[in-house]
Swiss-Prot record:
Coiled coil: none
Swiss-Prot/TrEMBL keywords: Ribonucleoprotein, Ribosomal protein
Protein name: Small ribosomal subunit protein uS2
Gene3D superfamilies associated with the record: Glucose-6-phosphate isomerase like protein, domain 1, Helix hairpin bin
Protein family (similarity comment): Belongs to the universal ribosomal protein uS2 family.
Keyword field contains Ribosomal protein: yes
Pfam families per the UniProt record, alphabetical: Ribosomal_S2 (PF00318)
């Protein structure tokens, strides 16, 4: 049984691509049709590719792997943080700092500074410092927390990265490629899929679409880490409660779908 149902994908708006004038020709094989100037993603392929990505993420987790979830666009920030945390993994959901992976030693020194500032605020050090100095240190801590809080406890370079919108996260993609870190990503119709190891053709702008697919990747890690079928059983229960969408229904998308904002 598939990890996610066609109905769930439709309801989350996963099938809405970008406007036809903003497309990458390499995504053609993942496009079902065009409607009102909007490309419609072939959800039959998305279902299969989610399964492939899920199984890969699960295998990485089962081998005690480390995952880094990346999504800095507003629509992805909450889902990235919440789902990575639920899976016991790590995340970057604000600006990607250049060198986060390729200059890991320097980043670790900034993380050490973040931990030092946290300790100072908790052990009473701030109470004996001048207010102006405390204000400066607090601002520094908040900035470090914003950009590095999600990887503060990451033990090493990740074994896999899940990325929402690799077109936006090009610096992260290039760093992963340089270090040969496999990438699983939500890839919209305006993105080059050649940079991605495990492509999930999907609307990467809709909050519900991002939440749905990010949660499935987190489920995969939870299942792999636990060595149990809890997440898979939840998926099966969800799918059993959903109506199936026939191939005829999918073909009728071109007559019923509404376009999304560019």
């Amino acid at each position: 049984m598939s990890v996610v149902s066609m109905k769930q994908l439709l309801e989350a708006g996963v099938h809405f691509g970008h406007q036809t004038r903003r497309w990458n020709p390499k995504m053609e094989e993942y496009i079902f049709t065009e409607r009102n100037g909007i490309y419609i993603i072939d959800l039959q392929k998305t279902v299969k590719l989610i399964d492939t990505a899920y199984n890969y993420m699960k295998d990485v987790a089962a081998n005690d792997g480390v995952a880094l979830f990346v999504g800095t666009k507003k629509q992805a920030q909450d889902a990235i943080e919440e789902e990575a945390t639920r899976a016991g993994q790590y995340y970057v959901n604000h600006r990607w700092l250049g060198g986060t992976l390729t200059n890991w030693k320097t980043i670790q020194s900034r993380i050490a500074r973040l931990k030092e500032l946290k300790k100072m605020s908790e052990d009473g050090t701030f109470d004996v410092l001048p207010k102006k100095e405390v204000a400066v240190l607090t601002k520094q801590r908040e900035k470090l927390e914003r950009f590095l809080g999600g990887i503060e406890d990451m033990p090493r370079i990740p074994d896999v990265m899940f990325i929402v919108d690799p077109h936006k996260e090009q610096i992260a993609v290039k760093e992963a490629q340089k270090l040969h870190i496999p990438i699983v990503a939500m890839v919209d119709t305006n993105t080059d899929p050649d940079d991605i190891d495990y492509v999930i053709p999907s609307n990467d702008d809709a909050i519900r679409a991002v939440r749905l697919i990010t949660s499935k990747m987190a489920d995969a890690f939870v299942e792999g880490k636990q060595g149990q079928d809890d997440a898979q059983q939840e998926t099966a229960d969800d799918n059993a409660a959903n109506e199936t969408v026939s191939e005829d229904s999918l073909k009728n998308l071109k007559n019923s779908v509404e376009g999304k904002e560019d």
